[in-house]
Amino acid sequence: MKYLILAYGNQQDYDYLGGKDGAAPAATAAEMAAIDEFLVGFTGALAESGELVETQGLTAPVLARRLDLRDGAPVVTDGPFGETEEVIAGYWMVDCASFDRATDIAAGLLTAPGRLSEAGVVVRPVMGAESDV
């Protein structure tokens, strides 16, 4: 069954990872190396087990656009979005034996170094996997 593991973050997390001091100091070179090593290892283990379908990181919220329908016409708003504190920072699509296994995989992200472990992770079954929930 397929599951989408969603990693969350906020603009401050992107600033931290991008080397920009803001509400919190920027990540040091050592912190960035530890984060990179963790993500390469985490994703590599999923690929090696055959459970990884796809993974992608997403750009910062300041680069996003939101579309809403107003008076029958689309209205485009460029980011950042003040009312949105938490955003999807990246995802891993996995194909594994069960919802419990997908949850165990996602829990591994909570052991990430630095700020990565603080924002939280959500696991959602892809349509068709509902019977496993």
Segments (PLM) and residue ranges:
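Conserved, structured core segments of small domains
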Residues: 1-133
